[in-house]
Amino acid sequence: GKILAAQYARENKIPYLGICLGMQIATIEFARNVCGLAGANSTEFNKETEHPVISLQEEQQGIVDMGASMRLGSCASTIYPGTKSYDFYGQTDTIHERHRHRWEFNPSYREQLEKCGLTIASVSQNEGLVEIIEIADHPFFIGAQFHPEFKSKPNQPHPLFSGLIAASLENS
């Protein structure tokens, strides 16, 4: 159901903000239905997938005991000019966001997905891991590998939440 929901939002221009797994689901959906990578998946769900567009980081692939092996805490990322996310963040080049996950966008598929129209809006500064994806010709289709809810406050929502609300109001 999650992949179908992401597809429905993408195809019908409904604002979509995928957080962590939601970003991964959006990537899987895009790979399958836009790039034609039948069976694209996450190795979390199918270790034998033909197209592992979401996978464990290479250095974690041999870890059997998963305890304390997550990517946790704040991480500096470069955000690219010309993206919606760059505008939402106030046109700053560096952002700091908090993480709690193991699986990542597989860099082996980056070029192929970009050729199909997926925009990589942000990557981590140390590892070069994909942090934000977008679809440029969509009113608001953004996936964030991090957790923007960790930096939101009642009177100061995270920029991506503000962007989602604004896009929802404009497209209702």
For each feature predicted by the language model, list its residue ranges:
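Active-site rim elements
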Residues: L72-C75, H96-R100
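Conserved beta-loop-beta connector loops within the AMP-binding
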Residues: K84-D93
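Acyltransferase
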Residues: Q91, R98-S172
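A broad, low-specificity signal marking well-ordered, structured residues that form hydrophobic/aromatic
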Residues: C75-S77, I142
